[in-house]
Amino acid sequence: MGMRMMFTMCLLVVLATTVISFTSDRASNGRNAAAKDKASDLNALNVRGCCSHPACRVHYPHVCYGRR
């Protein structure tokens, strides 16, 4: 192989790696946003004092675990 061919192959590998990385990152953004929204909702319940009310604590034990 000549130097031009090796350089071209190297550029092709770098380009392919960049494209794969970029598309997989964009695909995961939806999952990250959903997880962030759920965490925000749980934090809002905790901040509003849900864990101090027994009825609310029964419905959201995963938020109020160990709190009395």
From Swiss-Prot:
Region annotated Ser-Xaa-Pro motif, crucial for potent interaction with nAChR, chain positions: 52-54
Tissue: Expressed by the venom duct.
Entry's Gene Ontology cellular component terms: extracellular region; host cell postsynaptic membrane
Modified residues (Tyrosine amide): Y65
Compartments it resides in: Secreted
Paired cysteines (S-S): C50-C56, C51-C64
GO MF annotation terms: acetylcholine receptor inhibitor activity; ion channel regulator activity; toxin activity
Positions of the propeptide removed during maturation: 22-48
Entry's free-text remark on domains: The cysteine framework is I (CC-C-C). Alpha4/7 pattern.
Stated role: Alpha-conotoxins act on postsynaptic membranes, they bind to the nicotinic acetylcholine receptors (nAChR) and thus inhibit them.
Membership in a protein family: Belongs to the conotoxin A superfamily.
Protein name listed in UniProt: Alpha-conotoxin-like Mr1.3
Phylogenetic placement of the source organism: Eukaryota, Metazoa, Spiralia, Lophotrochozoa, Mollusca
